[in-house]
């Protein structure tokens, strides 16, 4: 059953609010609208890129009926905190999972991630976590007066690294969902994140080439969250 069906089956529709992340997944906001409810955006945890329980609690109202939690880039959301919030407030908590990969592929990506974690400089590498499958290896490229994310991406693409910006525009900035809300971590993540290649089929030489291309730009500061 899809998100629309699950919301309708739970009796959620006209007059209800459903909290969703604005960092990606415009399709979720669309599905909330199709169910007849109003999508409300909450900020993310800067380490997980998933909904932050404190931020969800802050935007929940008497009209809030559900929260849709998205597991991001292969890292599980903090379901314990969000589940407890749902129980306390009487909210339906739905999970929006990512496509799974064979165990061998996941194991190779995890090994690649460990290699990159120990060798990349000038970018903030993803925070390791139990169960992280590294569907995408997402780093931060803060500006700090030095090469920003977009300039960094152009430079390493020029060296043959196939990187991509995972979320170009947060959902609350799209014309059809524009909201006058303050989501600083969502905005910062959209400005700073860059997905580097981590396919299980990559060779050690390809990983070394990736590291060399990134580290050649060197010296970016890594501010704390």
Q: Positions of the model-derived regions?
A:
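Phosphate-binding glycine-rich loop
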Residues: 1-17, 28-33, 41-43
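PLP-dependent aminotransferase class I/II
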Residues: 66-70, 79-81, 88, 100-225
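Short N-terminal helix/helix-N-cap motif within the alpha/beta-hydrolase-1
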Residues: 4, 23, 77-78
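Short acidic capping loops at alpha-helix termini that bridge into adjacent secondary structure
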Residues: 14-17, 63, 148
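Short, acidic/turn-prone active-site loops that include or flank metal/cofactor-
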Residues: 24, 44-48, 98-99, 169-170
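Structured binding elements
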Residues: 36
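Structural detector of well-ordered beta-strand residues that form the stable sheet scaffold
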Residues: 19, 40, 93-95, 124-126, ...
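Active-site phosphate-binding strand-loop segment of PLP-dependent enzymes
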Residues: 47-101
């Amino acid at each position: 059953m899809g998100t629309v069906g699950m919301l309708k089956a739970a009796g959620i529709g006209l007059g209800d609010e459903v909290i969703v992340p604005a960092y990606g997944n415009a399709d979720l906001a669309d599905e909330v609208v199709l169910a007849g409810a109003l999508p409300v955006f909450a900020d993310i945890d800067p380490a997980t890129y998933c909904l932050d329980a404190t931020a969800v609690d802050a935007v929940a109202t008497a009209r809030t009926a559900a929260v849709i939690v998205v597991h991001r880039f292969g890292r599980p959301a903090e379901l314990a905190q969000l589940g407890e919030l749902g129980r306390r407030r009487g909210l339906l908590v739905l999970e929006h999972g990512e496509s799974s990969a064979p165990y061998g592929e996941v194991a190779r990506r995890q090994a690649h991630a460990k290699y990159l974690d120990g060798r990349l400089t000038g970018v903030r590498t993803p925070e390791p976590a139990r169960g992280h499958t590294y569907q995408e290896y997402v780093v931060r490229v803060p500006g700090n007066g030095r090469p920003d994310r977009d300039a960094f991406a152009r430079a390493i693409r020029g060296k043959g690294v196939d990187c991509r910006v995972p979320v170009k525009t947060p959902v609350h900035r799209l014309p059809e969902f524009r909201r006058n809300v303050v989501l600083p971590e969502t905005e910062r993540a959209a400005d700073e994140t860059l997905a580097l290649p981590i396919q299980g089929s990559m060779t050690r030489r390809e990983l070394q080439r990736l590291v060399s291309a990134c580290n050649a730009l060197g010296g970016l500061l890594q501010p704390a969250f």
